[in-house]
Amino acid sequence: KGMPMHEQTHPPMGKYLIALGEILFGVTPLGWRFVCALLGVLLVPVFYWFLQLLTENAQVSLVGSALFCMDFMHLTLSRIATLDSLVAFFILLMAALFLKLLKMAAEEISCGRKGPSAKVLCLMLLDGAAVGMAVSTKWTGFYAMLGMALCFFGAVGVWCCRAKRKGTSCRYSILLLAEGIGVYSVIPFVIYLLSFVPVMKALGEKNLFQVMWKVSVFMLDFHSGITFE
């Protein structure tokens, strides 16, 4: 509506999601809390799925999810309009998708496939989108992405070492690595860049890259300059 933007200390995606609730229900307590509460609820089944992938034990996953439902931080942050529950949802989603990706890739390697299947690539694209949403909501997602990258390189390294010990080709792992570098570099960056399109229009600018860089530098300067007394 041409109103000045007073908050640029975080990437804009999370604020768009909160605004979506306000569009649906107005600028009311329900409107500004709706999306955060919704994703806070969806965190529970995603957490169950993550535990199921991690432990392959339904009872452990159920108990862990039940304990998560009673976590006071989760309950509190999901009831207010903050970015924390939003970025937590996307980080947990990207972790679950990544774990599913590793399991699927390991199964294909054990079956002797020469390269990643279309299912693996689609899963990687979805995971890349989750990474992009996390980073575009809050830079906390970037640190989670770095941790995931270390796990990805580590898994590929382990698979290559196993292939060499068995005297087989590590072609699958190399192709998966190449696809991963491409997907996890391009998809998150594109989503992060496109999240600044409304910001560019609000500022009356025409260069999207310049707007993204300017706001990102402002965010970095703001957070690096925070002091506590």
Which role fits each region the language model picked out?
Residues G64-C69, T76, A96, V131, ...:
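Short helix- or helix-capping micro-motifs
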Residues F34-T55, L93-L97:
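Transmembrane-helix motifs of polytopic, lipid-linked glycan transferases
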Residues W32-L39, G64, L83, E179-V183:
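Alpha-helical transmembrane segments of multi-pass integral membrane proteins
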Residues G40-L43, F68, L83, V87-A95, ...:
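Hydrophobic core segments of transmembrane alpha-helices in multi-pass, intramembrane catalytic enzymes
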Residues K1, M145, F152-E229:
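Transmembrane-lumen/periplasm boundary regions of multi-pass, lipid-linked membrane glycan transferases
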Residues Q52-T55, M94-M124, A134, F153-A163:
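Membrane-interface transmembrane helices that cradle and orient dolichyl/undecaprenyl
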Residues M5-L17, V27-L30, E229:
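Extracytoplasmic catalytic/substrate-binding loops of multi-pass membrane glycan-assembly enzymes
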Residues C36, M73-L86, T137-T140:
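Short acidic/glycine- and proline-prone juxtamembrane loop motifs at membrane-interface regions
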